[in-house]
Protein backbone atom coordinates (compact mmCIF):
# COMPACT_ATOMS: atom_id res chain seq x y z
CA UNK A 1 0.00 0.00 0.00
CA UNK A 2 1.11 3.56 -0.73
CA UNK A 3 2.10 5.37 2.47
CA UNK A 4 3.74 8.45 1.01
CA UNK A 5 2.60 12.05 1.42
CA UNK A 6 -0.79 13.17 0.13
CA UNK A 7 0.70 16.25 -1.46
CA UNK A 8 4.11 17.35 -2.68
CA UNK A 9 4.43 20.92 -3.94
CA UNK A 10 7.26 23.07 -5.25
CA UNK A 11 6.44 26.67 -6.10
CA UNK A 12 8.48 29.68 -7.24
CA UNK A 13 6.83 33.10 -7.62
CA UNK A 14 8.11 36.64 -8.01
CA UNK A 15 5.67 37.96 -5.39
CA UNK A 16 3.63 36.06 -2.79
CA UNK A 17 0.78 37.40 -0.65
CA UNK A 18 1.40 36.41 2.98
CA UNK A 19 -1.21 38.42 4.88
CA UNK A 20 -3.76 41.10 4.14
CA UNK A 21 -2.02 43.64 1.87
CA UNK A 22 1.37 42.05 2.71
CA UNK A 23 3.86 40.47 0.32
CA UNK A 24 7.25 38.80 0.13
CA UNK A 25 9.28 38.67 -3.06
CA UNK A 26 11.18 35.98 -4.97
CA UNK A 27 9.54 33.23 -2.93
CA UNK A 28 10.51 29.58 -3.34
CA UNK A 29 8.44 27.02 -1.42
CA UNK A 30 8.74 23.25 -1.08
CA UNK A 31 6.09 21.42 0.95
CA UNK A 32 4.93 17.90 1.83
CA UNK A 33 1.55 17.24 3.48
CA UNK A 34 0.04 14.06 4.88
CA UNK A 35 -3.43 12.72 4.11
CA UNK A 36 -4.92 14.48 7.15
CA UNK A 37 -3.67 17.86 5.97
CA UNK A 38 -0.75 18.01 8.39
CA UNK A 39 2.52 19.51 7.20
CA UNK A 40 5.39 17.03 7.23
CA UNK A 41 7.89 19.41 5.66
CA UNK A 42 7.90 23.08 4.71
CA UNK A 43 10.82 25.03 3.28
CA UNK A 44 10.65 28.63 2.16
CA UNK A 45 13.16 31.18 0.89
CA UNK A 46 12.06 34.73 0.10
CA UNK A 47 12.88 38.42 0.39
CA UNK A 48 11.07 40.40 3.10
CA UNK A 49 11.83 44.11 3.12
CA UNK A 50 15.56 44.67 2.76
CA UNK A 51 16.77 41.12 3.39
CA UNK A 52 16.24 37.39 2.94
CA UNK A 53 14.02 35.23 5.11
CA UNK A 54 14.40 31.46 5.36
CA UNK A 55 11.92 29.06 6.96
CA UNK A 56 12.60 25.38 7.59
CA UNK A 57 10.25 22.90 9.25
CA UNK A 58 11.40 19.40 8.48
CA UNK A 59 12.32 16.02 9.97
CA UNK A 60 15.84 15.31 11.17
CA UNK A 61 16.14 11.60 10.41
CA UNK A 62 19.12 10.80 12.70
CA UNK A 63 17.31 12.15 15.79
CA UNK A 64 13.69 11.46 14.72
CA UNK A 65 12.81 15.06 15.61
CA UNK A 66 10.96 17.77 13.72
CA UNK A 67 13.23 20.81 13.46
CA UNK A 68 12.18 24.45 13.06
CA UNK A 69 14.58 27.15 11.86
CA UNK A 70 13.66 30.71 10.89
CA UNK A 71 16.16 33.42 9.92
CA UNK A 72 15.34 36.96 8.78
CA UNK A 73 17.80 39.73 8.00
CA UNK A 74 15.04 42.38 8.11
CA UNK A 75 13.08 41.16 11.11
CA UNK A 76 10.56 44.00 11.15
CA UNK A 77 9.57 43.45 7.52
CA UNK A 78 9.34 39.68 8.03
CA UNK A 79 7.13 40.01 11.13
CA UNK A 80 4.87 42.46 9.29
CA UNK A 81 4.72 40.32 6.15
CA UNK A 82 3.36 37.33 8.06
CA UNK A 83 1.01 39.34 10.28
CA UNK A 84 2.93 38.61 13.49
CA UNK A 85 3.74 42.13 14.76
CA UNK A 86 3.52 45.56 13.16
CA UNK A 87 5.71 47.71 15.42
CA UNK A 88 9.25 46.35 14.86
CA UNK A 89 11.60 48.03 12.41
CA UNK A 90 14.82 46.44 11.18
CA UNK A 91 16.74 43.92 13.23
CA UNK A 92 17.87 40.34 12.71
CA UNK A 93 15.66 37.42 13.75
CA UNK A 94 16.70 33.86 14.60
CA UNK A 95 14.30 31.15 15.79
CA UNK A 96 15.40 27.57 16.42
CA UNK A 97 13.36 24.74 17.89
CA UNK A 98 12.67 21.03 17.75
CA UNK A 99 10.24 18.37 18.92
CA UNK A 100 11.12 15.59 21.31
CA UNK A 101 12.64 12.51 19.70
CA UNK A 102 9.82 10.04 19.19
CA UNK A 103 7.45 12.42 20.99
CA UNK A 104 4.59 14.65 19.92
CA UNK A 105 5.66 16.17 16.60
CA UNK A 106 3.15 19.01 16.99
CA UNK A 107 4.96 20.54 19.99
CA UNK A 108 8.14 22.50 19.25
CA UNK A 109 10.45 23.76 22.00
CA UNK A 110 13.12 26.31 21.22
CA UNK A 111 14.59 29.78 21.52
CA UNK A 112 14.04 33.06 19.70
CA UNK A 113 16.50 35.93 19.40
CA UNK A 114 16.03 39.39 17.90
CA UNK A 115 18.92 41.87 17.73
CA UNK A 116 19.42 45.54 16.86
CA UNK A 117 15.80 46.53 16.27
CA UNK A 118 13.52 49.50 16.86
CA UNK A 119 9.97 49.59 18.24
CA UNK A 120 7.60 52.32 17.03
CA UNK A 121 3.89 53.00 17.51
CA UNK A 122 3.41 50.16 20.00
CA UNK A 123 0.16 50.96 21.86
CA UNK A 124 0.52 48.33 24.59
CA UNK A 125 4.10 49.30 25.42
CA UNK A 126 3.09 52.97 25.34
CA UNK A 127 0.36 52.27 27.91
CA UNK A 128 2.83 50.54 30.21
CA UNK A 129 5.35 53.37 29.97
CA UNK A 130 2.63 56.02 30.33
CA UNK A 131 1.50 54.41 33.59
CA UNK A 132 5.01 55.08 34.93
CA UNK A 133 4.71 58.80 34.04
CA UNK A 134 7.64 58.74 31.62
CA UNK A 135 6.47 61.09 28.84
CA UNK A 136 9.90 61.18 27.22
CA UNK A 137 9.82 57.48 26.40
CA UNK A 138 6.17 57.68 25.29
CA UNK A 139 7.16 60.48 22.92
CA UNK A 140 9.98 58.36 21.51
CA UNK A 141 7.61 55.47 20.85
CA UNK A 142 5.24 57.67 18.85
CA UNK A 143 7.99 59.41 16.87
CA UNK A 144 11.42 57.94 16.15
CA UNK A 145 10.88 54.80 18.21
CA UNK A 146 12.93 53.06 20.91
CA UNK A 147 16.05 51.10 20.02
CA UNK A 148 16.67 47.69 21.56
CA UNK A 149 19.96 45.85 21.27
CA UNK A 150 18.71 42.35 22.01
CA UNK A 151 15.66 40.23 22.79
CA UNK A 152 15.64 36.55 23.62
CA UNK A 153 13.11 34.06 24.90
CA UNK A 154 12.42 30.36 25.28
CA UNK A 155 9.17 29.10 23.79
CA UNK A 156 6.92 26.07 23.40
CA UNK A 157 4.73 26.12 20.27
CA UNK A 158 1.81 23.73 20.02
CA UNK A 159 0.18 23.72 16.59
CA UNK A 160 -2.80 21.47 15.79
CA UNK A 161 -6.10 21.75 13.93
CA UNK A 162 -7.89 23.28 16.94
CA UNK A 163 -4.86 24.60 18.86
CA UNK A 164 -2.28 27.26 18.03
CA UNK A 165 -0.64 28.18 21.34
CA UNK A 166 2.76 29.74 22.08
CA UNK A 167 4.06 29.60 25.66
CA UNK A 168 6.86 32.08 26.41
CA UNK A 169 9.38 31.73 29.23
CA UNK A 170 12.51 33.59 30.37
CA UNK A 171 11.89 36.44 27.93
CA UNK A 172 14.00 39.56 28.23
CA UNK A 173 14.95 42.54 26.11
CA UNK A 174 17.02 45.65 26.67
CA UNK A 175 18.05 48.92 25.09
CA UNK A 176 19.32 52.34 26.06
CA UNK A 177 15.91 53.49 27.36
CA UNK A 178 14.52 50.43 29.10
CA UNK A 179 14.73 46.75 29.84
CA UNK A 180 11.87 44.27 30.09
CA UNK A 181 11.23 40.70 31.12
CA UNK A 182 8.20 38.74 29.95
CA UNK A 183 6.56 35.33 30.20
CA UNK A 184 3.12 33.96 29.46
CA UNK A 185 1.05 32.62 26.60
CA UNK A 186 -0.29 33.68 23.20
CA UNK A 187 -3.41 31.86 22.02
CA UNK A 188 -3.31 32.47 18.28
CA UNK A 189 -6.56 30.57 17.68
CA UNK A 190 -8.53 32.71 20.16
CA UNK A 191 -6.34 35.78 19.43
CA UNK A 192 -5.69 36.39 23.14
CA UNK A 193 -2.62 37.22 25.22
CA UNK A 194 -1.69 36.61 28.85
CA UNK A 195 1.78 37.98 29.64
CA UNK A 196 3.42 39.26 32.82
CA UNK A 197 6.84 40.73 33.47
CA UNK A 198 9.02 43.55 34.74
CA UNK A 199 9.85 46.87 33.09
CA UNK A 200 12.92 48.92 34.02
CA UNK A 201 13.01 52.53 32.70
CA UNK A 202 16.76 52.97 32.57
CA UNK A 203 17.53 56.35 31.11
CA UNK A 204 15.39 58.54 33.39
CA UNK A 205 14.25 57.29 36.77
CA UNK A 206 17.21 55.07 37.50
CA UNK A 207 19.81 57.72 36.79
CA UNK A 208 17.94 60.01 39.19
CA UNK A 209 17.77 57.40 41.96
CA UNK A 210 21.42 56.50 41.50
CA UNK A 211 22.40 60.13 42.10
CA UNK A 212 20.56 60.46 45.42
CA UNK A 213 23.27 60.28 48.13
CA UNK A 214 21.47 58.10 50.70
CA UNK A 215 18.42 56.61 48.99
CA UNK A 216 20.47 55.88 45.90
CA UNK A 217 23.02 53.87 47.86
CA UNK A 218 20.29 51.91 49.61
CA UNK A 219 18.42 51.09 46.40
CA UNK A 220 21.50 50.29 44.34
CA UNK A 221 23.48 48.62 47.13
CA UNK A 222 26.19 51.19 46.46
CA UNK A 223 26.98 49.60 43.11
CA UNK A 224 25.42 52.21 40.87
CA UNK A 225 23.16 49.54 39.37
CA UNK A 226 19.59 50.73 38.80
CA UNK A 227 16.96 48.88 40.78
CA UNK A 228 13.76 50.89 40.30
CA UNK A 229 11.29 48.86 38.28
CA UNK A 230 7.63 48.06 37.74
CA UNK A 231 5.81 44.79 37.33
CA UNK A 232 3.09 44.57 34.69
CA UNK A 233 0.49 42.31 33.13
CA UNK A 234 -1.06 42.31 29.66
CA UNK A 235 -4.21 40.19 29.32
CA UNK A 236 -7.20 39.76 27.05
CA UNK A 237 -7.73 40.37 23.36
CA UNK A 238 -4.45 40.57 21.48
CA UNK A 239 -5.77 43.58 19.56
CA UNK A 240 -6.82 45.55 22.65
CA UNK A 241 -5.61 43.88 25.86
CA UNK A 242 -5.98 45.13 29.41
CA UNK A 243 -2.74 46.42 30.95
CA UNK A 244 -1.91 46.73 34.65
CA UNK A 245 1.23 48.23 36.19
CA UNK A 246 2.64 48.13 39.73
CA UNK A 247 5.37 50.82 39.78
CA UNK A 248 6.70 49.98 43.25
CA UNK A 249 8.91 46.99 42.53
CA UNK A 250 12.55 46.96 43.63
CA UNK A 251 15.00 44.53 42.04
CA UNK A 252 18.34 43.14 43.14
CA UNK A 253 21.31 44.31 41.03
CA UNK A 254 21.98 40.74 39.91
CA UNK A 255 18.51 40.50 38.39
CA UNK A 256 19.12 43.72 36.49
CA UNK A 257 22.37 42.41 35.07
CA UNK A 258 20.43 39.43 33.76
CA UNK A 259 17.88 41.67 32.03
CA UNK A 260 20.64 43.66 30.35
CA UNK A 261 22.64 40.58 29.28
CA UNK A 262 25.65 41.56 31.41
Question: Model regions: which residues?
Answer:
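Gram-negative outer-membrane assembly/targeting C-terminal domains
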Residues: 239-262
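Small-residue helix/turn framework positions
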Residues: 3-23, 28-235
